[in-house]
Amino acid sequence: MKGGRRGQVPVKQNQHRLNGEIRGVREVRLTGADGESVGIVSIQEALATAEESGLDLVEISPNAEPPVCRVMDYGKFLFEKSKATKEQKKKQKQIQIKELKFRPGTDVGDYQVKLRNLIRFLEEGNKVKVTIRFRGREMAHQDIGVDVLNRLKEDTDEFAVVESFPTKIEARQMIMVLAPKKK
């Protein structure tokens, strides 16, 4: 069979050396299970201390001179670490940019529906890109498009801050970006 390990997930290596894996050193700076510094001891003494307490000897800082080791429950340490990273991921929120398209002749009912959606997007914490599209002869009435944008700006004043307001028309459209107000 050709190939090799196709489709298999690579095995993740431990970031820390444990117990018998700590080789090539005679002395280590030992930290006890409760966090207090024991001092510089031989590797055998450190392993014996870890074994007596029923915990693991974990090499925390291998590049230090002498290497720093700590007596701890390694499984619990990894669990706490993964729990902390999950908490950080929960706190991060991806900001999306939602887009709403209007026309210069957008009717009052349609305007109200789109305004409701725009306010909902802002309350969810998303930015909103408002586009006014011009077709055919509507290009002659760009002032109506600016009026629609100004009306939107006034209607969303308590929810949003205008990030960018169009100064000129580009590719038959005007674009305004609204960002949610900080609470």
UniProtKB/Swiss-Prot annotation:
Organism superkingdom: Bacteria
SUPFAM superfamilies, per database record: Translation initiation factor IF3, C-terminal domain (SSF55200), Translation initiation factor IF3, N-terminal domain (SSF54364)
Transmembrane segments: none
Pfam name, any one: IF3_N
Matches recorded under InterPro entries: T_IF-3_C_sf, T_IF-3_N_sf, Translation_initiation_fac3_CS, Translation_initiation_fac_3, Translation_initiation_fac_3_C, Translation_initiation_fac_3_N
Cell compartments where the protein resides: Cytoplasm
Keyword terms of this UniProt record: Cytoplasm, Initiation factor, Protein biosynthesis
GO biological process, one term: ribosome disassembly
Keyword Oxidoreductase: no
A GO term from the CC aspect: cytosol
GO MF term set: ribosome binding; translation initiation factor activity
Record bears the keyword Transferase: no
Family per record: Belongs to the IF-3 family.
Subunit details: Monomer.
PANTHER family in alphabetical order: TRANSLATION INITIATION FACTOR IF-3, TRANSLATION INITIATION FACTOR IF-3, MITOCHONDRIAL
Protein task: IF-3 binds to the 30S ribosomal subunit and shifts the equilibrium between 70S ribosomes and their 50S and 30S subunits in favor of the free subunits, thus enhancing the availability of 30S subunits on which protein synthesis initiation begins.
Protein name in UniProt: Translation initiation factor IF-3
